[in-house]
Amino acid sequence: MTAMSPLQYQKQLRLNEARRLMLSEGLDASAAGYRVGYESPSQFSREYSRQFGAPPVRDLARLRMSL
């Protein structure tokens, strides 16, 4: 069981998949967001920032530096 609603869980899965796509396939934020079902790049960026604590570009730069 999780403390998340089904909608929150689905959103978390989509954002994690978008993050994986950006890291492993080199997609930009707009393309990754679109691939996981976001139609609006600004909505994707807003929800990504809430989930990971930074916008996609800054989060990915930080992750790549730590590899």
Residue ranges and their predicted role:
Residues 1-39, 61-67:
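Terminal helix-turn-helix DNA-binding modules in bacterial transcription factors
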Residues 43-44, 48:
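Short hydrophobic/aromatic patch on the recognition helix
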Residues 58:
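DNA/chromatin major-groove-contacting recognition/catalytic segments
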Residues 27, 49-50:
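Short, charged low-complexity intrinsically disordered segments located at boundaries
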Residues 1, 50-51:
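Alpha-helical DNA-recognition elements
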